[in-house]
Amino acid sequence: MVFLGERIPPWHRLLFVIPFLVSSLGLIGLGATPAAADPAGSVVAVVIDRLTPLAPRPNDTLRISGKLLNTSSTTVNRVSARLGIAASPLTERAQITKVSGLELNPEIDPVDYFLNQTKVDVSDALQPGDEASFEIAIPVNDLPLGRDGVYTLMVEVLGVGGAGNIDRQGGVRTFLPWMGRDSNAINLVWLWPLADYPAQEANGVLLNERIPRSLAPGGRLDSLLNIAAKNPIKISWIADPQLLQIAQDIAGGYQVRNGDGTSVGDLSQDAGQWLARLRRALDSSAALQPENSAAGDRLPLRVTPYADIDAGAVTRSGLDSDVVRSTTMAASIASTVLQQSVNGTLYWAPGGRLNKRTGDLLASSGVRTVILRGDALPPSNANTISTGLGVLGTTYGGMNAVLVDQGLSATLSLPQSSTSNEILMRQRFLAETAVLSQLITDDSPSRMIVAGPQDVYWDPAPDSLNELLDSTGTVPWLNSASLSDLLTENNAGIPRKRGGYGPKAQAAELSSSYVQKVQGVSEQLASFTAVLDNPSGVTDVYAEAILRAQSSAWRLEPAAGEELVTSISISLQEKINMVFALSEGTITLSGESGLVPVTIANDLDRSVTVGVQLRGTPRARLESEPLYDITIEPGKKVSVEIKATVIGGRTLSAGVQLLTPDGQDFGSPARIELESTAYARAAAWVIGAAFLAIVSFVVVGITRRVHQAATGSRSNSQKNEPHV
């Protein structure tokens, strides 16, 4: 296929014996002219509606059609469009990225020839804001295509602008793979994650209708399932078990948070149908597996830890047990919903990187496969092309590292809001894989490449994704392979080094302040669980809700995560408040020590065992030992008496604090007032003694004054008597 004679007229063959760039005769023969000068800015936008075929062959016809839109404020006259193409194929993937980012600058234009025979007149005068349709068609045999590879392709718009000259008024570049049937194909593993934002409260109420709408016809998850169901042998299923669980919940009827209240959702039937279709699609994939598949009677589905937990952030905050719980419970939840065993648990690292501590924890909890970015484990030799499998070392042994190709995942994340964007994304994806197939040498230990999104919450355009999957196995440079196929390879075939996990990766995690709030709710749950005689069926729903609050999804929507944490905390506090002390008012002790009666109520539907303690304010004025092992049946009250000693004569404010069996505070304390009659009697004696003292002083004073008055009167009488 590298010989031009296979695709151009015989009288042109001689012209292409020498390279295109130095063959001016060849340019004339093809009706091609050098690239036109580029204006200061593009004024006409090119919107592509169609580009066929995906992989052109000799005798095919290349067709490109679309619209031209005048985005300027002036009229563009004599508008035409024509096709341009590079003289030689791209040889490196970096060139694809470079070409995609280039401006329409003639000094750096990668397009060498513009084919005049493709020129079509579009509009005599394209007014501002107006659009006009165009279609370019050319036999593939007439294209100046040389050796196999990816060629830069361009639709150039010409017209008369303000300067009065025919100049380039706009254009769009894309890629044209030109690969022979004897191409050395790569094996493409398509990872197909199904997950969504787990915004479900502990009581099952949804914070919003995002998931029900996504499961309904036309929704994101509905589209992903439809595409996968059409390509059961080409994709590798991965799902968050929480999504399967919530889909089942929705199918059984659901409520949605609506301000302070709730409303009944009406998309239950759609959720049930989605689950049924998923089961059928998984059965189809299982039926197409090779007879010697290791999956046995398991579904060809791997699951992430429950709610796609952000293991890095959670581990950093010391909540290791939550990571272990979300990992170990994942497969059983999925199997329960799907009524059949699944093919194990893996961890899809948010952001594509994993620190050593988190890797060790995952390995210790039974995870044997992690999904990372390619540069998380780059080849030790910089000249080696990275393929799809490596080994991630941990303290507990090596884990399979599935390495998603960064170029492909970045391409899948390109804008796809229009048909034109979808086509450009599709062509770039095909270009990336075609160049890869040429770069991987025959002696490489692997030709498997992993394609997948940058995160599990992807939202691709269905049409373009369908076309890409259709191309896998039909274009000559792409064969399909499964994740199971990949995992049978030697994961140490390419020597690798471990990439870093630096400040940028840490900053992308759930924030430490957020995880601290989650930790606070976990402590609430631990306290509540401690007093329940039988926590089964109550605390597990809160434990799952707390795991949902630790999802990596909240990296993308932190406000929704905060709302979920708050709702769980409020609901849990309401449960805690159903076990409480009824005591209030003033209690008088018959002496400085006495018994304080306390009534404890249990409004829960199951028995609890608590302790209780009196605490004075200030504490130094009250001496009291806690009382433990108080069991209260559901819906009942129990009265107990606590011995207490009040120090001092004033009324003492005290709290009646319930305790967990291990002595931790439970709930909020009730407030009472304590006073002692012993101090009241003492005060009365003091007052009586003081009164008697005062009376004595008064009597003595009066007596003294009377005596003094009498003495003075006698003295005066003696002075007035005559001397004899």
Predicted features by range, described:
Residues 58-74, 592-602:
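Short beta-strand elements of extracellular/lumenal beta-sandwich folds
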Residues 85-110, 616-627, 662-665:
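Short aromatic-acidic-glycine turn motif
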Residues 142-181, 564, 648-708:
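Terminal connector regions
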Residues 34-46, 569-578:
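Proline/serine/threonine-rich low-complexity linkers at boundaries of modular beta-sandwich domains
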Residues 165-292:
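Active-site beta->alpha N-cap acidic-glycine motif
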